[in-house]
């Protein structure tokens, strides 16, 4: 279930202010954020945002296709290590 349309999309105010300052000055540098729940706005396109995944900040380059999605969708919090392998040792135990 999505967010109510009357409320509008959520974006962290500090993050949006940093993006606006960078757009005005023309500078491009990595912005660190812990706000995984912020919606990606069109003003963010072309910037690199380091999104926290619980351990480190994952750099995410924002493209036009990402607009409307959340920042946390592009920084996975879990690492999939694969399912159990069929090895000689595991089959010998049966």
Swiss-Prot record:
A GO molecular function for this record?
structural constituent of ribosome
Gene Ontology biological process: ribosomal small subunit assembly; translation
- Give the source's domain of life in one word: Bacteria
Keyword list (alphabetical) reads:
Ribonucleoprotein, Ribosomal protein, RNA-binding, rRNA-binding
Sorted alphabetically, which Pfam families does this protein's record hold?
Ribosomal_S19
Keyword Transit peptide applies: no
Q: Which Gene3D superfamilies match?
A: 30s Ribosomal Protein S19, Chain A
Q: Which GO terms describe its cellular component?
A: cytoplasm; small ribosomal subunit
Q: Which family does it belong to?
A: Belongs to the universal ribosomal protein uS19 family.
Q: What does this protein do?
A: Protein S19 forms a complex with S13 that binds strongly to the 16S ribosomal RNA.
Task: State the name under which the record lists this protein.
Answer: Small ribosomal subunit protein uS19
Give the organism the record lists: Halothermothrix orenii (strain H 168 / OCM 544 / DSM 9562)
Query: Gene encoding this polypeptide?
Result: rpsS
């Amino acid at each position: 279930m999505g967010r109510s349309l009357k409320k509008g999309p959520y974006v962290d105010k500090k993050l949006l202010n940093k993006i606006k300052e960078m757009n005005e000055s023309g500078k491009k540098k990595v912005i660190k954020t812990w706000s995984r729940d912020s919606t990606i706005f069109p003003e963010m396109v072309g910037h690199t945002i380091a999104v926290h995944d619980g351990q480190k900040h994952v750099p995410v380059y924002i493209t036009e296709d990402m607009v409307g999605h959340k920042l946390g969708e592009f920084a996975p919090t879990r690492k999939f290590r694969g399912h159990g392998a069929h090895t000689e040792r595991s089959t010998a135990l049966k």
